[in-house]
Amino acid sequence: MRKALALPLLAIFLGGCASNPADRDISGTWINQVAIDAAAKGGPLREALQAYGPNLEWDVNTKASQARYTNGFENVEGRLLGEKSGAWKVDFYGSSASELKRDGGQLQQAASENEPEQVFDRAQIPVPEGAPIGASFERALYSAYMGGSWTIANGQGEGSTVQFQADGQVSGLPGADRYALCLAGDCASMSSTNDNMWLQLNGQGNAYIFARKGKELEIFQAVNTALADEMPQYTPGERKWLLEKQ
């Protein structure tokens, strides 16, 4: 009789292990790695973000019943309503809702009337304590898209080596010590279909248009074609630099 009971008890024990709560845990910071990987192939940045977006990062705290996300323009906070069959519903205070669940090592955001299905991976690059939501995605993107060493093939400082850091610092590019890539929002609207970045030195800077083609990065002066009382509209002007990835 004892032997007969042993197998059912073992099956129950193994079944409990297979449904480990940790495998369903959605707490933590999750980033849109699919969009980053697409951009890292060396094409237009916003084209990749639009194809695999719109959301870039989720930050979930199941213990506090809180969830928030960013699409690079808006930071939206919601309330977790609880888990049902492995899925968590996020209520954005009556305006809309999202459904999140674990899919292996990824976080899956179910498709809705307003957004497509998306998948997110746990953030791996550390960010400073208290960093705003989106910082994890931004650092991972900067590392994948702008990382490594670049040579100035044409422009001021020709022959010099340029390095763009994940934290927004840049070295070797004349007249700049920090940079920021435009991901969405007003800065994107100002440059139409063109990608743009912000370059600054000692806290003062300007917008620039850029074009990424494989291992080449062209940076152009941004020419504002709008009237003084209108939102700026930037088009590519004189090419300032041609960078080639080493």
Give the location of each predicted region.
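Short, structured interface segments
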Residues: L107-R139
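Positively charged n-region of N-terminal signal peptides that target proteins for export
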Residues: M1-A4
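N-terminal helix-cap/turn-to-beta initiation motif at the start of protein domains
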Residues: C17-I31, E129-T151
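Bacterial N-terminal signal peptides
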Residues: A6-G15
